[in-house]
Amino acid sequence: MGKATVTWVQRLQFVGTDSTRHSVVISAPDEANGVGMKPSELLLVSLGACTAYDVVNILQKKRKILHHLHVEVEGEQQTSAPWPFTRIHLHYVIAGEGLSERDVAQAIHLSHEKYCSVSATLRPSVELTYDFELTADGEHSAP
C-alpha cells in the first residue's frame, strides 16, 4: 500500500514525503510562492515517471541498450473549478542500440495497459494518448 504525507511549510508551500522519506516541494504557481511544483503538474510528472520506469525496465529485460529517454507530458484541463484533467498526452523520445519501433511501441503499450498504476488510476476518467520518437544518439531534443 502506498503512503505519503503532505506538510504545510508556509504561505502556500508544502513538502510531500513518501514512505521512504523522499521529499518534493509543492507550491502555488504564483511568483511569491513558486519554489515547488504545482500539484496538478506533479500528477503529470508522476504519470511520466511511472511509465518511463516501466519502459526502461521492459526494454532492459529485452537486453536493449538505452542511451536516452525523456517523456514530455501535456495535460488539458477543464476551464472551471475544480479543473480536472480531461486529456493527457505523453510523447516519448528514446535513443539506444538495437531498438526497433516495434520494441518501443510494445514497451509503451505494456506500461500503459498492464504495469503503470498511475495510468490505471487515471484511465477511467482521463483520455490518455501517447506517441514516440525513436532517435539516433545525439539527435534527441532537450527536455
Protein language model features and the residues they cover:
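Extended beta-strand/beta-hairpin segments
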Residues: M1-V45, V56-P143
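Short glycine/serine/threonine-rich phosphate/pyrophosphate-binding segments
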Residues: Y53
